[in-house]
């Protein structure tokens, strides 16, 4: 497989789906390009019009195996034959414990370790904020300009990437201070290291 463009971009099928999306979906995401995914294989993504692209996004953060990796597909199929969903808050599940134990063994920190599973990075940020407040008694946070943490209210309060993401949601959680990264290659204050 290799990249191949078969239609003008976006193609006719993609344009129809994008138009339908704009009518039916909440405009809560900023999509940078008019791509409508049909399927993927490894590093390639094919749109609904048959155009093949080299996918430099390949999912968010945790899907670094590429699209449709055979081992991942097999694991999903095996699990789907048992059950599709369970809540770790309602009952226990052996595989969940095994994954938690493996993470605890491999996390390079000393002392007592425990795992908290979430559905998303935003939920992980919310949990981290709650843990920080609970264990320190403090309620202020430092976050970086240009950093993205999620779209839930707490995570959005820390997010410093796109102002449009916060539009209509003020006031956000108080006590968040945004600062620049401590890297002056492109210093926002036009300063240099001594």
What is each of the regions a protein language model found here?
Residues 1-41, 91, 96:
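Active-site-adjacent loop/helix segments that line or gate small-molecule/cofactor pockets in enzymes
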Residues 6, 46, 180:
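Residues in well-ordered beta-strands of folded domains
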Residues 46, 65-66, 157-159:
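Short beta-strand-to-turn element immediately C-terminal to the catalytic PLP-Schiff-base lysine
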Residues 101-194:
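PLP-dependent aspartate aminotransferase-fold enzymes
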Residues 4-7, 52-142:
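Glycine-rich loop-to-alpha-helix module at the N-terminal edge of alpha/beta enzyme cores
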């Amino acid at each position: 497989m290799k990249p191949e463009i078969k239609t003008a971009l976006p193609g006719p099928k993609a344009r129809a789906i994008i138009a339908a999306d704009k009518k039916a979906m909440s405009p809560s995401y900023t999509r940078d390009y008019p791509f409508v995914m049909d399927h993927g294989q490894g590093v390639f993504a094919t749109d609904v019009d048959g155009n093949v692209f080299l996918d430099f996004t390949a999912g968010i953060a945790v899907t670094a195996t590429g699209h449709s990796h055979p081992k991942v597909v097999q694991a999903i199929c095996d699990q789907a034959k048992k059950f599709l969903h369970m809540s770790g808050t309602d009952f226990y599940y052996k595989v969940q414990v095994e994954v938690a134990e493996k993470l605890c063994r491999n996390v390079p920190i000393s002392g007592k370790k425990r795992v908290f599973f979430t559905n998303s990075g935003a939920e992980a940020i919310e949990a981290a904020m709650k843990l920080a407040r609970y264990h320190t008694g403090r309620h202020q946070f430092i976050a970086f300009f240009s950093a993205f943490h999620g779209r839930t209210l707490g995570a959005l309060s820390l997010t410093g990437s796109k102002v449009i993401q916060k539009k209509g949601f003020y006031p956000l959680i108080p006590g968040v201070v945004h600062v620049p990264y401590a890297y002056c290659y492109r210093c926002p204050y036009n300063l240099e290291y001594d």
